[in-house]
């Protein structure tokens, strides 16, 4: 009879025990890519995250300094299948937190009994119209060459911002490598977006598969999967919309373009009701592709006949542009990205400058002010400018960077541009003063 084999070494026994203990633990249940957003409902916050496997959707939270998990909320998850060759599956979880105390700070984590995230914190929206919120504004941020990311992370941690506005173009691109590029990007921005509401609009880099990655990964107010929506904060009504409906209509139809236009008109009409405009006098829009720019890349905004600005006459029926609509309803500030540069415009309408005065151009201007802030950093690097700026171009820079915005009160708004190339130096600033809002302000 053969001799019995020698006993396994202690290390192997330990490994076998560990494997046995974890053999039945599900793989891929850990929450990741956590981010929050305003749902457009007072005293609420929406928490979104993903997991590789299906799990329960739970957020445990409590007031900062109080009992850690005194509240619990449950939500739901939806399956998302990446359209790449691998058809990778992920689950997107959404949980709505309600009855939050305005302006109070909360600690939370998300997940389930199969795995919890680390601890995060946020401040509930201050519902007062006298609230003076601070924003970070940028577009065109990728997971490769994200020049502004580290500075935004630090400023988020020290409480500089109440809201982040990401004005289109994420990751470069969310769908690439069967969605893994999107996963990595969402993990990168978690250090910002899990703490401060991360509000978005779609850009041209989200176009693939009918914007499915953008629609699945982000959670914005309304029922259009974040393609267009509006919300209120402090003295402002903020409108997010898609410029891409003017460019991908052959792939996805004209219906979205006309539906969005009619929604925009109805939303602007409602915002301009006297009682609403008195309460929230500032109307701010955010869309990816600008109406105007002085870049040298032959983009839509470099042409007088910009599709976003004037519409398209090559469609049936013709598609209306947005400049006249925004002017008609007295939009104060229009935020754009797409160009990998920063450009501040003089108050402009119909390609003409309408400064408040030669000495104080941004005091009671007679047209909307446009800001292009698409230089946060991505693999496509910088864009360039034409040598001689247009008459409506007030300041421009090719530095990597982002924009800070402070809504001071009903009449004053402050904006500044931060250069990453110059180690956080403020390279441009503007105070917009509006003693009168609405279309009557243009007269």
Swiss-Prot record:
It comes from the Eukaryota. Binds 1 Fe cation per subunit. It comes from Danio rerio (Zebrafish). It catalyses: a phosphate monoester + H2O = an alcohol + phosphate. Its EC number is 3.1.3.2. Belongs to the metallophosphoesterase superfamily. Purple acid phosphatase family. InterPro entries: Calcineurin-like_PHP_ApaH, Metallo-depent_PP-like, MPP_PAP, Purple_acid_Pase-like_N, Purple_acid_Pase_N, Purple_acid_PPase_C_dom. Pfam families: Metallophos, Metallophos_C, Pur_ac_phosph_N. One of its GO terms (cellular component) is extracellular region. Its main location: secreted. Zn(2+) binds at residues 169, 204, 288, 338. Keywords: Glycoprotein, Hydrolase, Iron, Metal-binding, Secreted, Signal, Zinc. The keyword Glycoprotein applies. Fe cation binds at residues 140, 169, 172, 340. Glycans are attached at residues 53, 76, 126, 210, 313, 355, 409. This is Acid phosphatase type 7. It is found in: Secreted. GO terms for molecular function: acid phosphatase activity; metal ion binding. Residues 1-23 form the signal peptide. The keyword Disulfide bond does not apply.
């Amino acid at each position: 009879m053969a001799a019995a084999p020698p006993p396994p070494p202690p290390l192997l026994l330990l490994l076998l025990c560990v494997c046995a203990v974890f053999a039945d633990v599900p793989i891929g249940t850990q929450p990741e890519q956590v981010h929050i957003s305003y749902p457009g409902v007072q005293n609420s916050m929406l928490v979104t995250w993903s997991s590789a496997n299906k799990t329960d959707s739970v957020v445990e939270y409590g007031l900062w300094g109080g009992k850690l998990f005194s509240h619990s909320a449950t939500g739901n998850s939806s399956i998302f299948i990446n359209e790449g060759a691998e058809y990778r599956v992920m689950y997107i979880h959404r949980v709505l937190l309600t009855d939050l105390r305005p302006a109070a700070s909360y600690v939370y984590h998300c997940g389930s009994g199969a795995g919890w995230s680390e601890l995060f914190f946020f401040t509930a929206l201050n519902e007062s119209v006298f609230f003076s919120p601070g924003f970070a504004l940028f577009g065109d941020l990728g997971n490769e060459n994200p020049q502004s990311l580290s500075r935004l992370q630090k400023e988020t941690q020290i409480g500089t911002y109440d809201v982040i506005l990401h004005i289109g173009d994420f990751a470069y691109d969310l769908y690439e490598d069967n969605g893994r590029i999107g996963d990595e990007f969402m993990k990168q921005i978690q250090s910002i977006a899990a703490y401060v509401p991360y509000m978005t609009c779609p850009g041209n880099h989200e176009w693939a598969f009918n914007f499915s990655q953008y629609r699945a990964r982000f959670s914005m107010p309304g029922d259009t999967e974040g393609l267009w929506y509006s919300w209120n904060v402090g003295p402002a009504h903020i409108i997010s919309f898609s410029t891409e409906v003017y460019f991908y209509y052959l792939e996805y139809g004209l219906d979205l373009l006309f539906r969005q236009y009619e929604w925009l008109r109805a939303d602007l009409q409602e915002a301009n009701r006297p009682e609403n405009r008195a309460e929230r006098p500032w109307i701010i829009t955010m869309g990816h592709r600008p109406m105007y720019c002085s870049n040298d890349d032959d983009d839509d905004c470099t042409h007088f006949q910009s599709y976003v600005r004037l519409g398209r006459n090559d469609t049936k029926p013709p598609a209306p542009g947005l400049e006249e609509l925004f002017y008609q309803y007295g939009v104060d500030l229009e935020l754009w990205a797409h160009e990998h540069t920063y450009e501040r415009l003089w108050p402009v309408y119909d390609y003409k400058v309408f400064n408040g005065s030669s000495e104080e151009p941004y005091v009671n201007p007679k047209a909307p002010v446009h800001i292009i802030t698409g230089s946060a950093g991505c693999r496509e690097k910088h864009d360039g400018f034409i040598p001689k700026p247009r008459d409506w171009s007030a300041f421009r820079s090719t530095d990597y960077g982002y924009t800070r915005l402070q809504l001071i009160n009903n009449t004053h708004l402050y904006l500044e541009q931060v250069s990453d190339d110059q180690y956080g130096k403020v390279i441009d600033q503007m105070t917009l003063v509006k003693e009168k809002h609405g279309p009557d302000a243009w007269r």
